[in-house]
Curated annotation (Swiss-Prot):
PTMs per UniProt: Polyubiquitinated via 'Lys-11'-linked ubiquitin by the anaphase-promoting complex (APC/C), leading to its degradation by the proteasome. Deubiquitinated and stabilized by USP37 enables entry into S phase. Ubiquitinated during the G1 phase by the SCF(FBXO31) complex, leading to its proteasomal degradation.
Annotated InterPro entries: Cyclin, Cyclin-A_N, Cyclin-like_dom, Cyclin-like_sf, Cyclin_A/B-like, Cyclin_C-dom, Cyclin_N, Cyclins_cyclin-box
Protein name: Cyclin-A2
Tissue-specificity statement: Ubiquitous. In the testis, expressed in germ cells and in the ovary, in both germline and somatic cells.
GO CC annotation: cyclin A2-CDK1 complex; cyclin A2-CDK2 complex; cytoplasm; cytosol; female pronucleus; male pronucleus; nucleoplasm; nucleus
Residue span of region Disordered: 1-62
Amino acid sequence: MPGTSRHSGRDAGSALLSLHQEDQENVNPEKLAPAQQPRAQAVLKAGNVRGPAPQQKLKTRRVAPLKDLPINDEHVTAGPSWKAVSKQPAFTIHVDEAEETQKRPAELKETECEDALAFNAAVSLPGARKPLTPLDYPMDGSFESPHAMDMSIVLEDKPVNVNEVPDYQEDIHTYLREMEVKCKPKVGYMKRQPDITNSMRAILVDWLVEVGEEYKLQNETLHLAVNYIDRFLSSMSVLRGKLQLVGTAAMLLASKFEEIYPPEVAEFVYITDDTYSKKQVLRMEHLVLKVLAFDLAAPTVNQFLTQYFLHLQPANCKVESLAMFLGELSLIDADPYLKYLPSLIAGAAFHLALYTVTGQSWPESLAQQTGYTLESLKPCLVDLHQTYLKAPQHAQQSIREKYKHSKYHSVSLLNPPETLSV
């Protein structure tokens, strides 16, 4: 496994990541030739200088096309000429210390089956399968029959939620709380990005929501993909023309990690309207894995909400759906939610959903398990409440459209409370 970057407290300079130069994605700026016009226009591509960009939309054929949205609503000024897009690499790695690369030994070639059998004369290749001999007596299907299936085996086949096992519930929560700190993206990473903005990231996440709905992916897959994107951008500078490629590779990795039947690579190439080739997607997947040091089991807001729902007595499906809706709303905007841990965002989403539907407050049982009091939830709760109030006017509407479905009890149509008693 490649070595990981360890960041110190001070901000250090950027080092170029050396990759194959056939796509001219990671070339020395002094040797970089003018980029050729791609066959299909990239999603977040803009002018050569970072600044107010024209309205863009993500490209896809299967997912419904997005409305033209401004991708740079932030106040930026034209930078010096050396920051021109055509004069800088597509990816730049931010390191605080020199990385130590570890080379893996070359893999031995596998021995062919025929060669292996040649060393053992007692082993022979299987011949044609003979049909089974029919039974000479009728099978007894009564309960006393030895052929009858034990009903206890049938009962054991029911799926079990590991979070509901009391013996492990506390250990699981403690482990997730430790890992969420290790897998947390840097809060101010967008300030170090020379060519992308928070609004571009919001467009990308909104598009990934549509991709997840198109392929019926789990909500956890979406949360993981956004975590991978933020952690990748915390260490790498990316040009806007490659931002969708990063998001596509992150969604591919999250699907492989979480889904039973993940979509094929060709499917992800297809939804980008062939803006990127299969080779580019696979190379980016490899790069994301290296930057993340193969740490893919990141705790998410969705995971903590699943634990918190166990304290909901009696169970309330509308509260659960609304909490999931609020948790996904926090994915759209990097500011201010990157400064909060997933467990804290999940607590604020759970309390706000519970208060909206039932008028109840943060349960005492959750306060004991998590250590979060209503007072400690207040900063995140206030931000999430404002996001909830402004959701109908937000530029990105895929999450609201998703939760209008009866599957989620149409919770995005509920009126948020005007005030909170905290």
